[in-house]
Regions:
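N-terminal signal peptide c-region/cleavage motif recognized by signal peptidases
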Residues: 16-17
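Bacterial N-terminal signal peptides that target proteins for export
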Residues: 1-9
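Compact, glycine-rich, soluble single-domain proteins
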Residues: 23-126, 130-161
Length: 161
C-alpha cells in the first residue's frame, strides 16, 4: 500500500474514533448516552445500570421498562433518603423524558436494576438490554461494565470522572 493511502486511512480512522469510543444509541428523537454498569462480585445477584436519555423531539416520551438476557428480571428503581435512611424502591409507571429534556439514570438516583444475574458482570463486558419506551418502542442498548468503584461512565480510557 502506498504511504499516501496509509496516511489517508489513518486520518480517517482518527476522525471516526471519538464516536466509536462514546458508545450510545440514537433512536428517533431519543439519544441514549453512555449506558454503563459496575463489575459485580461472584455470587452477587443484582447490579445497576446507568445512562442518559435525551429527548430531542417536541413530545414527551416515557421509559416504561427494560429487559436483558443477562438477568432474570430488570426493573427501574429509585434511591432516596427516607427518615435518614437510604432506600431503594421500584418505579411504577415509568420515567418521563420531557420534550427537549434529559433523564439521567445514575448511582444514588434513578437507575436500571438487573436482578437475578445469570453470571457476574466483569469489567469490559458489554451487557445487552432492551429499553421500552411509550412512544419510541423497544430500543436495544449495551451497558459497558466498569470497575466496581466507578461513579460515572468511562469513555476512551479517561477513568471514572
Amino acid at each position: 500500500m502506498k504511504p499516501s493511502i496509509r496516511i489517508m486511512l489513518a486520518a480517517t480512522a482518527l476522525v471516526a474514533a471519538p464516536p466509536l469510543l462514546a458508545h450510545g444509541v440514537a433512536a428517533g428523537a431519543l439519544a441514549i448516552g453512555h449506558p454503563w454498569s459496575r463489575e459485580t462480585a461472584p455470587g452477587q445477584k443484582a447490579g445497576g445500570g446507568f445512562l442518559t436519555i435525551t429527548n430531542k423531539g417536541k413530545t414527551e416520551d416515557r421509559l416504561l421498562s427494560a429487559t436483558s438476557p443477562a438477568a432474570a428480571d430488570v426493573q427501574i428503581h429509585m434511591m432516596k433518603v427516607e427518615d435518614g435512611v437510604m432506600r431503594m424502591r421500584q418505579v411504577t409507571g415509568g420515567l418521563a423524558i420531557p420534550a427537549g429534556g434529559t433523564l439521567e439514570l445514575k448511582p444514588g438516583g434513578y437507575h436500571i436494576m438487573f436482578m437475578g444475574l445469570k453470571k457476574p458482570f466483569k469489567q469490559g463486558d458489554m451487557i445487552p438490554a432492551t429499553l421500552v419506551f411509550a412512544r419510541q418502542g423497544k430500543v436495544a442498548v449495551r451497558f459497558k461494565v466498569q470497575p466496581i468503584a466507578s461513579t460515572a461512565p468511562m469513555e476512551g480510557g479517561h477513568g471514572g470522572h
